[in-house]
């Protein structure tokens, strides 16, 4: 079910900046259908909306975009359409066009464009072209680092101002969206968070974390 937070979304604070949001391995035009000026929609699993109680069992670990995955970040799993989850804003922090990387760089700007073209080719099954674009993308990234000294990309750094807003939006939906997906003033269900912290994850999370007892 689609839940539209509209002006209640924390992303609405950046509407005037006209960000273009991106999710890795998804065409940014898909995400634009969910998040644009005045529109902030999320595809939410109806089972969550129909529940009276939600039991949330996260595995705490580091996260290269969000910093940490815990009880709040774990609610990213309530959506069945990842394209509706903004992870970064295309562009650089320095000029205010986005938060995917820090310093302004024409090379990285082209890298972002090629990254999206690669995604489209992969979806269409154009594997050879996708591999060529991947090589070109990585080459531009290396050149971008050499010229700007900025090693960051795809929002994977401490200056990411997008993913935390997505996380808070989803937590707001879990707490206040009723069974029809409408946002109410009062909480609509109870939430129990139980962290599985026997072994956590540190360093290169969330994909390749090191065990932390």
Give each language-model segment a name.
Residues 1-213:
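Extended, low-polarity segments enriched in aliphatic/aromatic residues
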């Amino acid at each position: 079910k689609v839940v539209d937070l509209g002006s209640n979304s924390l992303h609405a604070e950046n509407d005037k900046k006209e960000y273009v949001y991106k999710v890795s391995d998804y065409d940014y035009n898909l995400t634009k259908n969910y998040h644009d000026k005045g529109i902030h929609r999320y595809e939410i699993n109806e089972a969550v909306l129909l529940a009276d109680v939600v039991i949330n069992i996260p595995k705490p670990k580091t996260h290269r975009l969000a910093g940490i995955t815990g009880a709040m970040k774990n609610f990213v799993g309530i959506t069945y359409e990842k394209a509706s989850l903004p992870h970064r804003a295309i562009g650089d922090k320095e000029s205010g066009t986005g938060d995917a990387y820090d310093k302004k760089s024409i090379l990285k700007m082209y890298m972002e464009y090629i990254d999206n073209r690669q995604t489209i080719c992969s979806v269409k099954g154009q594997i050879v072209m996708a591999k060529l674009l991947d090589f070109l993308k990585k080459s531009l990234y290396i050149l971008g680092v050499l010229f700007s000294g900025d090693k960051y990309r795809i929002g994977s750094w401490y200056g990411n101002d997008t993913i935390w807003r997505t996380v808070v939006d989803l937590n707001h939906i879990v707490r206040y969206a009723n069974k029809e997906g409408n946002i109410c003033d009062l909480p609509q269900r109870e939430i129990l968070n139980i962290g599985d912290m026997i072994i956590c994850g540190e360093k290169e999370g969330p994909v390749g974390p090191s065990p932390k007892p």
